[in-house]
Amino acid sequence: MKTGIHPNYKKATVKCACGNEFETGSVKEEVRIEICSECHPFYTGRQKFASADGRVDRFNKKYGLK
């Protein structure tokens, strides 16, 4: 690899819209994000499950199978 062409890699503070902050490595000093693991519904357990029937399920309901 050539020397002097790569950006400097440093510690970066990641700030979420919910107020959570954590450190990671990046070429930027500060990274702002809209959603993180502290406020994302999948990680917090507030996830809503949509019950979408597939084509096979609709066929089975229609013809009384299973």
Swiss-Prot record:
| Species name | Bacillus pumilus (strain SAFR-032)
Q: Which gene encodes it?
A: rpmE
GO BP terms: namely: translation
Quaternary structure and interacting proteins, as annotated = Part of the 50S ribosomal subunit.
Q: Which InterPro entries match?
A: Ribosomal_bL28/bL31-like_sf (IPR034704), Ribosomal_bL31 (IPR002150), Ribosomal_bL31_A (IPR027491), Ribosomal_bL31_sf (IPR042105)
Single GO cellular component annotation?
A: ribosome
Record function comment: Binds the 23S rRNA.
Q: Name one GO molecular function term.
A: rRNA binding
Q: Which keywords are on file for this protein?
A: Metal-binding, Ribonucleoprotein, Ribosomal protein, RNA-binding, rRNA-binding, Zinc
Write down the HAMAP family for this protein, in alphabetical order: Ribosomal_bL31_1
**UniProt family annotation:** Belongs to the bacterial ribosomal protein bL31 family. Type A subfamily.
Q: Name one Pfam family in it.
A: Ribosomal_L31
How the cofactor is bound: the record states: Binds 1 zinc ion per subunit.
Q: Which residues bind Zn(2+)?
A: C16, C18, C36, C39
Q: Which cofactors, by name?
A: Zn(2+)
Superkingdom, taxonomy of origin: Bacteria
Name of the molecule in the record? Large ribosomal subunit protein bL31
